[in-house]
From Swiss-Prot:
This is Phospholipid phosphatase 4. The gene is Plpp4. Residues 102-110 are annotated as: Phosphatase sequence motif I. Keywords: Hydrolase, Lipid metabolism, Membrane, Transmembrane, Transmembrane helix. PANTHER family: LIPID PHOSPHATE PHOSPHATASE, PHOSPHOLIPID PHOSPHATASE 4. Belongs to the PA-phosphatase related phosphoesterase family. The record marks 206 as: Stabilizes the active site histidine for nucleophilic attack.
Length: 271
């Protein structure tokens, strides 16, 4: 119980840091006159995939898949616990890393011009006249948090399904339905990332790098709890594969149980 409490505490701390960084102001990068065209895209009020919906998809999809697998395969509580710990760590680390990069880089969004100058008229001092909160949020383009969270949560779901379905083991290779089922979450993550470019909220580099960050954390945290996808036991977490200490002690040979040689018929020779 103590180890579990520590694991939960680490994740709570990471999510706390993520929420804290949401309210910090980013670096105010100088915008050169010759690059202002990059940030003159229209300011879209209604996103295709709002932030709340993105978080719901990224957090609830892996949890729902884990619960469905438990019902179908009747997995034990230990396996459920390991899966929850893995995906929660991936999401927490991803949030902290993405927000840290956002604050340090301070890249303007594609619609930054109209956040800064709502009337479309730029002054010579380049001083923004728009809402300060809207302007500050407009300096958090790189990397895309929509993309990173989508690929973190849904990317983990892909790894989890690939392990459960044995997509890359001898028994599962060549069965296309298994592969299609496993990569479906990644397809959804890609759609979320691309929607941010359609909303003029991110440049293509923002969505691409965000996706890479999310996928890296998803794989790292998955491998912390599960064996490689090519392993024959890839459907089980490491905890379930460990041999209990009591069994190890029973199997260990002792001096009393060591085999002895028959002594009958053996006579002492000259020394």
């Amino acid at each position: 119980m103590r180890e579990l409490a520590i694991e939960i505490g680490v994740r709570a701390l990471l999510f706390g840091v993520f929420v804290f960084t949401e309210f910090l102001d980013p670096f105010q990068r100088v915008i050169q006159p010759e690059e202002i065209w990059l940030y003159k895209n229209p300011l879209v009020q209604s996103d295709n995939i709002p932030t709340r919906l993105m978080f719901a998809i990224s957090f609830l999809t892996p949890l729902a898949v884990i619960c469905v697998v438990k019902i179908i395969r009747r997995t034990d509580k230990t396996e459920i616990k390991e899966a929850f710990l893995a995906v929660s760590l991936a999401l927490a680390l991803n949030g902290v890393c993405t927000n840290t990069i956002k604050l340090i880089v301070g890249r303007p969004r594609p619609d930054f011009f109209y956040r800064c100058f709502p009337d479309g008229v730029m002054n010579s001092e380049m001083r923004c006249t728009g809402d300060p909160d809207l302007v500050s949020e407009g300096r958090k383009s790189f990397p895309s948090i929509h993309s990173s969270f989508a690929f973190s949560g849904l990317g983990f779901t892909t790894f989890y399904l690939a392990g459960k379905l044995h997509c890359f083991t001898e028994s599962g290779r060549g069965k296309s339905w298994r592969l299609c089922a496993a990569i479906l979450p990644l397809y959804c993550a890609m759609m979320i990332a691309l929607s941010r470019m359609c909303d003029y909220k991110h440049h293509w580099q923002d969505s691409f790098v965000g996706g890479v960050i999310g996928l890296i954390f998803a794989y790292i945290c998955y491998r912390q709890h599960y064996p490689p996808l090519a392993n024959t036991a890839c459907h089980k977490p490491y905890v379930s594969l460990r041999v209990p200490t009591s069994l190890k002690k029973e199997e260990r040979p002792t001096a009393d149980s060591a085999p002895s040689l028959p002594l009958e018929g053996i006579t002492e020779g000259p020394v």
